């Protein structure tokens, strides 16, 4: 509409239904913009739905031709990405201000056990035990570089004085070169089983050694999952 022609937009990747994204990256091919970048962003945000906001725009990097002179592909929002980072939010205190973006559990979890279990995720492994059936990935091998649980204080609690005890809010962070369909939600569901004491810390490693999706924990709600960063 703003450019006067149909534009094909390509995103950094797909997420499960109900999952949120911050700092999501996409690209499109176009002639030079007819507006200043800030004005273009303003006009875009004026016509986009309230649930979508554009924060920046810039020209994609020029492709670097290899020293051997072989073909170098243009920059691509999805295929040029080298890492993706997700966050999953859980709270243990009833909180109507965060309900839309965090999963409320009535009983606390053992973060120390869950963090020790995270060690099995680090490195290059077959994560098919956490992949939802029907995925069309050519391989289930992913390389995880970070996985951890930690407590945090949400903004409304620190700024507005909403009651908040130590450990009432926790977040899981995981970063990898790629992810399988439903992978993060299945990992979190399995971690919760460990945090509740229903499974040993070694369970994650055992699942990855030969378990199937039906052996792992349940898929947790998508509303509390955020694609938070795409690395290039």
Roles of regions detected by a PLM:
Residues 1-232:
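Structured-RNA-binding interfaces characteristic of tRNA pseudouridine synthases
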